[in-house]
Amino acid sequence: DERPLVRHQIQLAKSKARLEMLDVAMAAEELTLLLQETAQTHGENAAITRAVRETLGKAHYYAAYLLKTSGAAESEWRPYAERTRQIFRFLAEHQEPGALANYEERVASEFQKTINFKQSP
Protein backbone atom coordinates (compact mmCIF):
# COMPACT_ATOMS: atom_id res chain seq x y z
CA ASP A 1 0.00 0.00 0.00
CA GLU A 2 2.03 2.92 -1.34
CA ARG A 3 1.50 6.32 0.24
CA PRO A 4 0.71 8.93 -2.43
CA LEU A 5 2.78 11.70 -0.81
CA VAL A 6 5.96 9.60 -0.83
CA ARG A 7 5.35 8.53 -4.42
CA HIS A 8 4.77 12.15 -5.46
CA GLN A 9 7.93 13.30 -3.68
CA ILE A 10 9.94 10.63 -5.52
CA GLN A 11 8.40 11.61 -8.86
CA LEU A 12 9.21 15.26 -8.16
CA ALA A 13 12.83 14.38 -7.33
CA LYS A 14 13.12 12.43 -10.60
CA SER A 15 11.72 15.34 -12.59
CA LYS A 16 14.12 17.74 -10.87
CA ALA A 17 17.00 15.45 -11.85
CA ARG A 18 15.80 15.46 -15.47
CA LEU A 19 15.67 19.24 -15.35
CA GLU A 20 19.23 19.43 -14.03
CA MET A 21 20.32 17.23 -16.95
CA LEU A 22 18.51 19.70 -19.26
CA ASP A 23 15.97 17.12 -20.39
CA VAL A 24 13.53 20.00 -20.20
CA ALA A 25 10.80 18.64 -22.49
CA MET A 26 10.46 15.34 -20.61
CA ALA A 27 10.67 17.08 -17.22
CA ALA A 28 7.91 19.53 -18.20
CA GLU A 29 5.71 16.71 -19.46
CA GLU A 30 6.18 14.70 -16.25
CA LEU A 31 5.65 17.76 -14.06
CA THR A 32 2.45 18.73 -15.86
CA LEU A 33 0.96 15.30 -15.15
CA LEU A 34 2.31 15.30 -11.60
CA LEU A 35 0.78 18.72 -10.94
CA GLN A 36 -2.65 17.46 -11.95
CA GLU A 37 -2.24 14.39 -9.76
CA THR A 38 -0.95 16.21 -6.68
CA ALA A 39 -3.62 18.90 -6.93
CA GLN A 40 -6.33 16.25 -7.13
CA THR A 41 -4.88 14.11 -4.32
CA HIS A 42 -3.54 16.71 -1.89
CA GLY A 43 -5.25 19.95 -2.95
CA GLU A 44 -4.06 23.10 -4.71
CA ASN A 45 -2.49 24.60 -1.59
CA ALA A 46 -0.55 21.54 -0.41
CA ALA A 47 3.21 21.90 -0.08
CA ILE A 48 3.86 19.10 -2.58
CA THR A 49 1.54 20.69 -5.17
CA ARG A 50 3.24 24.05 -4.68
CA ALA A 51 6.69 22.45 -5.08
CA VAL A 52 5.61 20.70 -8.29
CA ARG A 53 4.13 23.93 -9.67
CA GLU A 54 7.32 25.86 -8.83
CA THR A 55 9.49 23.23 -10.54
CA LEU A 56 7.20 23.29 -13.57
CA GLY A 57 7.66 27.06 -13.72
CA LYS A 58 11.42 26.53 -13.70
CA ALA A 59 11.11 23.98 -16.51
CA HIS A 60 9.21 26.46 -18.67
CA TYR A 61 11.76 29.16 -17.84
CA TYR A 62 14.63 26.88 -18.88
CA ALA A 63 12.80 26.01 -22.10
CA ALA A 64 12.31 29.69 -22.94
CA TYR A 65 15.91 30.52 -22.05
CA LEU A 66 17.40 27.64 -24.03
CA LEU A 67 15.28 28.39 -27.09
CA LYS A 68 15.99 32.11 -26.95
CA THR A 69 19.75 31.74 -26.48
CA SER A 70 19.96 29.19 -29.28
CA GLY A 71 18.48 31.71 -31.70
CA ALA A 72 14.93 30.37 -31.95
CA ALA A 73 12.24 32.69 -33.23
CA GLU A 74 10.26 34.61 -30.63
CA SER A 75 7.15 32.67 -31.63
CA GLU A 76 8.90 29.51 -30.40
CA TRP A 77 10.17 30.69 -27.01
CA ARG A 78 7.50 33.27 -26.10
CA PRO A 79 4.81 30.70 -25.08
CA TYR A 80 7.23 29.17 -22.55
CA ALA A 81 8.08 32.59 -21.16
CA GLU A 82 4.39 33.42 -20.86
CA ARG A 83 3.64 30.13 -19.12
CA THR A 84 6.51 30.80 -16.71
CA ARG A 85 5.02 34.20 -15.88
CA GLN A 86 1.57 32.68 -15.33
CA ILE A 87 2.86 29.95 -13.03
CA PHE A 88 4.93 32.26 -10.85
CA ARG A 89 2.14 34.82 -10.69
CA PHE A 90 -0.23 32.07 -9.54
CA LEU A 91 2.27 31.07 -6.86
CA ALA A 92 2.61 34.68 -5.74
CA GLU A 93 -1.14 35.23 -5.63
CA HIS A 94 -1.69 32.11 -3.55
CA GLN A 95 0.94 32.91 -0.97
CA GLU A 96 0.75 35.26 2.00
CA PRO A 97 -1.15 38.53 1.44
CA GLY A 98 1.90 40.72 0.73
CA ALA A 99 3.41 38.29 -1.75
CA LEU A 100 1.47 39.60 -4.75
CA ALA A 101 2.55 43.18 -4.03
CA ASN A 102 6.17 42.02 -3.78
CA TYR A 103 5.79 40.14 -7.05
CA GLU A 104 4.34 43.20 -8.80
CA GLU A 105 7.23 45.36 -7.51
CA ARG A 106 9.82 42.84 -8.74
CA VAL A 107 8.19 42.65 -12.17
CA ALA A 108 8.15 46.46 -12.46
CA SER A 109 11.78 46.64 -11.32
CA GLU A 110 12.94 43.99 -13.80
CA PHE A 111 10.99 45.66 -16.58
CA GLN A 112 12.65 48.99 -15.79
CA LYS A 113 16.09 47.33 -15.80
CA THR A 114 15.35 45.86 -19.23
CA ILE A 115 14.31 49.25 -20.59
CA ASN A 116 17.40 50.92 -19.12
CA PHE A 117 19.64 48.19 -20.56
CA LYS A 118 18.18 48.56 -24.05
CA GLN A 119 18.59 52.36 -23.92
CA SER A 120 22.23 52.31 -22.80
CA PRO A 121 24.71 53.18 -25.59
How would you describe each model-predicted region?
Residues 6-9, 13, 20, 48, ...:
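"A position-specific structural signal for the A-helix of alpha-solenoid helical repeats
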Residues 20, 24-41, 61-106:
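Short coil/linker segments at helix-helix boundaries
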Residues 1-4, 46, 50-53, 81:
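Inter-repeat boundary and helix-capping residues of tandem alpha-helical solenoids
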Residues 9-15, 37-43:
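Short, charged, low-complexity loops and linkers
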Residues 29-32, 50-54:
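Carboxylate-rich helix-loop segments that flank metal/cofactor sites and access channels
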Residues 45, 70-73, 117-121:
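Alpha-helix capping and helix-coil boundary motifs
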Residues 2, 15-22, 44:
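Short coil/turn segments at secondary-structure boundaries
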